[in-house]
């Protein structure tokens, strides 16, 4: 199953979606293992949506299909607490329009996810890089509170039984 259909079928609101693209303006400067992340907002007017922060557009909401245009690989993670995930998804909308960057009043993709979950009561550790606290994909994927439910590089990994309860 491709990641878009998997997310539409199984992923709860607030799931975090890591993707790698064939071409990225920032991939060579990014020490993160996974190069981009977004929060699955869920559906609105029958459209599946993702909130992300990009170099050119800052924090924005895009259709799930567009989020995956040109992707090479994808992973989807969730928490056990679905209510917390819904709060984080709702929080993501309050950050729309913030410009991209690493300053106090700026937002890059991993910081977006960390901020949304911080406001939902889930703190994320950061890495100290060049005197700044920076969030990377590893801060989520190495945290055992996050459960990987999809990996496009390991399609036998799906934890659909976990999602069904």
From Swiss-Prot:
Subcellular location: Virion; Host cytoplasm
Family designation: Belongs to the orthopoxvirus OPG091 family.
Note: Displays sequence similarity with a group of bacterial permuted NlpC/P60 proteins. Thus, the ancestor of the OPG091 gene might have been acquired from a bacterial source at the onset of poxvirus evolution.
The UniProt record lists the keyword DNA-binding: no
Keyword check for Methyltransferase: no
GO CC, one annotated term: host cell cytoplasm
Subcellular location, principal: virion
Function: Contributes to virulence in host but not to replication in cell culture.
InterPro entries according to UniProt: Papain-like_cys_pep_sf, Peptidase_C92
Domain of life, per lineage: Viruses
Keywords: Host cytoplasm, Late protein, Virion
Protein name stated in the entry: Protein OPG091
Top-level taxonomy: Viruses, Varidnaviria, Bamfordvirae, Nucleocytoviricota, Pokkesviricetes
